[in-house]
Structure formats: C-alpha cells, structure tokens
C-alpha cells in the first residue's frame, strides 16, 4: 500500500475513533477521501458538489452511527470496508498498477450496493433532462 493510501487509512481510523464509533465503515473512508484532489475532480465530472457530499457523509456519521462511551475501545474495520479495499486493489492490478489510488477506492465504494455511502453519492448526481427535438 502506498504511503498516501496508508495515510488515508490512518485518518479513516482516527475519524472513527474521534466519533467514538465501534466500527470503521466505508462512510468513514468516503469522508476522508472526499478531501483528496483526485476525488474532487471525479465528483466534478459526475456533477456532484464535493461540499454537499462531505456534508451529507458527516451528517450520516454524526446522526446515524451509534457512539460508545468507553475511550479504551478501538474501532474495528467492517467486512464491507475490507471488501472495498480488496475490490479496489483488484481494480488497480487489472489496470496494471501495483498500488491503489483514491479513484480505485471511490469506484469500489460506489460498487457496494445498498450502503449509505452509495445512497449519498447517487442522490447528489445532477441528471439533466435530455433535450427534446421539436418536430
């Protein structure tokens, strides 16, 4: 894993711990990668405002994820988070790269069905109506 990705993973675990969450989820990871230039560029191509996405992800983390009270508990990664990383690494290998990048992680997060992360991202896509030709 590259130093950049390891730093993002560390920040993801720190975010979960700061929120006193039992688990480190893909929503924590999404919150962290939303600050990267690469993901911001991808979101712009998808016509998603990164600030709106970040706001919605942090709202989800604050309001929908239960917190614990014991400061000694270390958050544990979920199976879904592991799957996201495995899928992202496979994506990188298929593209001839040995290391992940944030693009691989974002694609993998979007591939997880029925998750808050996917719902938030898809709900922010601005789909313009097709233009109709007048006969």
Cite the ranges covered by each PLM segment.
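Chalcogenol-based redox active-site neighborhoods
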Residues: 135
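Histone-fold recognition with a strong bias for associated Lys/Arg-rich disordered tails
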Residues: 1-128, 132
């Amino acid at each position: 894993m590259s130093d950049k990705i390891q730093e993002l993973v560390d920040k993801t675990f720190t975010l979960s711990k700061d929120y006193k969450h039992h688990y480190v989820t893909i929503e924590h990871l999404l919150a962290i990668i939303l600050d990267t230039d690469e993901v911001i560029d991808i979101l712009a191509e998808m016509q998603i405002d990164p600030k709106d996405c970040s706001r919605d992800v942090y709202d989800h983390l604050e309001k929908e994820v239960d917190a614990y009270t014991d400061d000694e508990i270390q958050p544990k990664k979920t199976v879904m988070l592991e799957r996201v990383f495995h899928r992202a690494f496979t994506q990188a290998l298929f593209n001839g790269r040995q290391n992940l990048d944030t693009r691989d992680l974002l694609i993998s997060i979007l591939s997880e069905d029925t998750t808050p992360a996917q719902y938030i991202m898809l709900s922010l896509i601005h789909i313009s109506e097709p233009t109709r030709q007048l006969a």
